[in-house]
């Protein structure tokens, strides 16, 4: 190499200086040696520059060659990888690649499992809907049967009450006829200006006392109530002088289109009400039927009773919403 040759020459020159220290006798020889060493140094510097340039060119050539080889290898590697990918893609399309077949088998297995589970879930949903439909049908039938029984009981109670009232009317027909005769006589006397009893003072009577200012139906109901009370207490419990006072109409009560209007409020079937009677504790009940002259209700213990609208008008009973 140029640098090594130069160092070798310098080392040789030093050896020469060391080898001839004793030849100090001739100065001419020293001058010749100095001139020869100077020429050799000039030639060696020129050779070193040429060698450096030549080596630089060689290095550049080698670098370009290596870059070309690297580029060729990179292109070759890209083509090989591309060919491998294309081959693998063809295998996948042909269902032959193991990397594709194994996940595909897992996916198909999962699909079969999920399809089976979905089928079972569908059957369960259908069964649940069918059971719900059957339950609704059964509930509707039971509701219909209960409504039929309730309607039957209501109609039966109404008919029995009408039969009972007819029986009572049949037994008390003679009494009512006497009442009618008395009423007619009293009207005739009021119309007759020359009647001697017109200015007669009121007579205090004992026993049931009936006010004839009421309607005929109210009189009949009051008389029936009095007879029931007398029959329940018995003849030995009846006090000798008891005056029954009929209260005047103090409340507004009427039946319109299957509803009851009482003291400015409307009451309908199925509503829960509180029934208040004098000298008794209030009770809650549910309205079952509203007729033209009576209201049927059902108590909490299951017993059924009725109220006459005239009783509400007189204030014997009072009702209110709960």
Swiss-Prot record:
Give the GO terms filed under biological process for this record.
negative regulation of transcription by RNA polymerase II
Q: Where is this region: Disordered?
A: 1-56
List keywords of the entry alphabetically. Answer: Coiled coil, Nucleus, Repressor, Transcription, Transcription regulation
GO (cellular component) term, any one: Sin3-type complex
Report whether Transcription shows up as a keyword of the record: yes
* Subcellular compartments: Nucleus
Extent of Acidic residues compositional bias: 17-51
Composition skew (Basic and acidic residues), residue ranges: 1-16
What molecular function does GO assign, one term?
histone deacetylase binding
InterPro entries reported in the protein's UniProt record: Sds3 (IPR013907)
Q: Which residues form a coiled coil?
A: 50-99, 147-178
Entry keyword Nucleus: yes
Primary location recorded for the protein, binned into one broad class? nucleus
Function, as annotated: Involved in the histone deacetylase (HDAC1)-dependent transcriptional repression activity.
What the record says about family reads: Belongs to the BRMS1 family.
User: What is the protein named?
Assistant: Breast cancer metastasis-suppressor 1-like protein
- The organism is Xenopus laevis (African clawed frog)
Query: Which taxonomic lineage is given here?
Result: Eukaryota, Metazoa, Chordata, Craniata, Vertebrata
């Amino acid at each position: 190499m140029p640098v090594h040759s130069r160092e070798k020459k310098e080392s040789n020159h030093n050896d020469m200086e060391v080898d001839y220290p004793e030849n100090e006798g001739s100065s001419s020889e020293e001058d010749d040696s100095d001139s020869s060493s100077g020429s050799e140094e000039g030639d060696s510097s020129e050779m070193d520059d040429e060698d450096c340039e030549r080596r630089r060119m060689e290095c550049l050539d080698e670098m370009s060659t290596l870059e070309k080889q690297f580029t060729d290898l990179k292109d070759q590697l890209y083509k090989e990888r591309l060919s491998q990918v294309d081959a693998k893609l063809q295998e996948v399309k042909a269902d032959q690649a193991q990397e594709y077949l194994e996940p595909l088998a897992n996916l198909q297995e999962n699909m079969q499992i999920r399809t089976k589970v979905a089928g079972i879930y569908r059957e369960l949903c259908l069964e649940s809907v069918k059971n719900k439909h059957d339950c609704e049908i059964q509930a509707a039938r039971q509701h219909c049967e209960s409504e039929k029984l309730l309607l039957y009981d209501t109609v039966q109670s109404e008919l029995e009450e009408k039969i009972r009232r007819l029986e009572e009317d049949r037994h008390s027909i003679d009494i009512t006829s006497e009442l009618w005769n008395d009423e007619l006589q009293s009207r005739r006397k009021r119309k007759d200006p020359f009647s001697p009893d017109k200015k007669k003072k009121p007579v205090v009577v004992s026993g049931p006392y009936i006010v004839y200012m009421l309607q005929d139906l109210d009189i009949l109901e009051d008389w029936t109530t009095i007879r029931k009370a007398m029959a329940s207490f018995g003849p030995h419990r009846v006090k000798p002088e008891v005056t029954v006072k009929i209260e005047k109409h103090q409340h507004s009560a009427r039946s319109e289109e299957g509803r009851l209007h009482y003291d400015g409020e409307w009451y309908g079937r199925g509503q829960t009400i509180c029934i208040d009677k004098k000298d008794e504790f209030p009770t809650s009940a549910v309205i079952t039927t509203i007729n033209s002259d009576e209201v049927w209700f059902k108590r909490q213990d299951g017993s059924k009773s009725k109220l006459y609208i005239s009783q509400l008008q007189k204030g014997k009973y009072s009702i209110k919403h709960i």
